[in-house]
Amino acid sequence: NLFDACVEKAVNGFVNAGVPMEKLILGVPFYSRKWDGVKGAGCRNGLGMEAETVGGYGGDYGELKESWIGKRGFIRYWDEQAKVPYLFDGETFISYEDCESLGVKIAYLKEKDMGGIMFWEYKCDPSGELLSFIKKNM
C-alpha cells in the first residue's frame, strides 16, 4: 500500500519476511517533495490537504536553506506523525528532511539495531550540514 507508507511498516515488512534487522539500512533524502495548489489549508497548514498537482521534486536541502525556509512567505511546520518538517505558504507544500528529523530517524535505527543509514544524494547538501549531523550522531 503506497498510500500508507512509513518507515516502521517497511522495516516490519522486511523483518517479517526474514531479513535480519542488522541488514536493514534506513534511507533518507537530502531533497524535498513539493505540491502546488494546496486547497483548503485552514488550520492544518497544508498538512494532508488536497493539491492540484501530484507532487514532484521540490529542490535540494541547500536550495531550501538558501531560498525557501523562512522566506517567500513560507513557514516551517512540524508533522508530528511523520516526524519531518514541512514548509507551507498557504498554497505550496514542501516536505523535506533536516537535522531534527534526521535525529529522530537515527534514534529509531539505533533503538532497532538496524545496520545503518544512507542518503540521496551528496550534492543536495552543499554545506555538509546534514552529512555532518549524521556523522556526529551515528
Residue ranges and their predicted role:
Residues 2-39:
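Active-site region of glycoside hydrolase catalytic domains
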Residues 3-11, 98, 102-105, 130, ...:
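Stable alpha-helical elements in mature extracytoplasmic
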Residues 26, 109, 117:
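Conserved, mostly hydrophobic/aromatic
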Residues 28, 121-123:
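Active-site proximal loops enriched in glycine and acidic residues that flank catalytic Cys/His/Asp
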Residues 28-108, 137-138:
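Glycan-binding loop/region signatures in secreted carbohydrate-active enzymes
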